[in-house]
A protein has these predicted regions:
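Active-/binding-site microenvironments in catalytic and ligand-binding cores
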Residues: 22-273
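Bacterial N-terminal signal peptides
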Residues: 7-21
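Positively charged n-region of N-terminal signal peptides that target proteins for export
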Residues: 1-7
Length: 273
């Protein structure tokens, strides 16, 4: 973990130094010192035997290949990963719902790094598992916290991360296959609100702490289409959003770079200054 944190710091520092986030160019020691004093929040569920996947997908598997002493006298361990693109904390690439959209390896890295806001919709979602976040929710948030910055990463906190890893509570069902898809019941983002985020706030990306940016009962996935057809990637199954402030923090969301991928596992880190 220590090595990971140091690696994250180095990456964030690089973004500040060379302008990945569009904030600066060149070397600024002050930015590095600010990062040294920053707090990092991991927004990623660990992948393991209890990782939640879409009802039609196979479970994540870590298959042991070798572990032990070698003839050369040194210890060696290696595993093989078996996983769906769209399971656990992951990204949806535009091609997931747009035949002309960007594949995972084609998404500009600028989409993964930037200032972010957290929209807390946990109260209405607690009352209604089928709640869809509306434009009015965004207008009310802006009345309380100020305008959502243009080109921000918007994170929607439904409160459903607290149910992880219970499939029954998180997805609304333990059923698998098509029957399981038909029984899904969790909140999401209304397609009209998604269109508003794209047109009025030019968002970089949208994330949510449920299994899908569309609510569970969706059959046409209009919200996916509204975002991905405009090359706005989606982050799903986020964790620990409750630990974030409402605004003025940064996000680094780096997916595995898969050629031709429609999605993939995502490590998401918030940087609190």
């Amino acid at each position: 973990m220590k090595g990971l944190v140091h690696g994250v710091c180095a990456l964030v520092a690089a973004s500040y130094w060379v302008g990945i986030a569009g904030c600066t160019s060149g070397y600024h020691r002050g930015n590095y010192l600010a990062l040294e004093q920053a707090r990092f929040v991991d927004l990623t569920h660990a992948f393991g035997a209890d990782t939640i996947v879409w009802p039609t997908e196979g479970d994540f598997r870590l298959v042991g290949q070798q572990a032990g002493e070698t003839p050369g006298g040194y210890y060696y361990a290696s595993n093989r990963l078996e996983m769906a693109e769209h399971g656990g904390t992951h990204i949806d690439a535009p091609i997931h719902f747009d035949k002309n959209g960007q594949t995972l390896d084609q998404i500009p890295i600028e989409r993964f790094v930037g200032t972010a806001v957290r929209i807390d919709v946990s109260t209405p979602c607690a009352r209604d598992r089928g709640y869809r976040v509306s434009t009015r929710d965004f207008e009310q948030w802006e009345a309380a916290h100020g305008r959502i910055p243009n080109r921000a990463i918007v994170l929607l906190e439904t409160g459903f991360a607290r149910f992880w890893p219970s499939r029954k509570e998180y997805l609304g069902t333990e059923l698998r296959g098509r029957e399981g898809v038909g029984a899904l019941h969790f909140p999401g983002l209304h397609p009209d609100a998604a269109t508003w985020l794209v047109r009025e706030r030019q968002v970089k990306a949208v994330g949510i702490d449920t299994a899908s940016i569309d609510y569970g009962q969706s059959t046409q996935f209009e919200t996916h289409v509204a975002l991905l057809s405009r090359n706005v990637p989606v982050f799903e199954n986020l964790a620990n959003l409750r630990a974030l402030p409402d605004r003025d923090f940064d996000i680094i969301a780096l997916p595995m770079k898969i050629s031709g991928g429609t999605g993939g596992p995502l490590r998401v880190v918030a940087v609190l200054h």
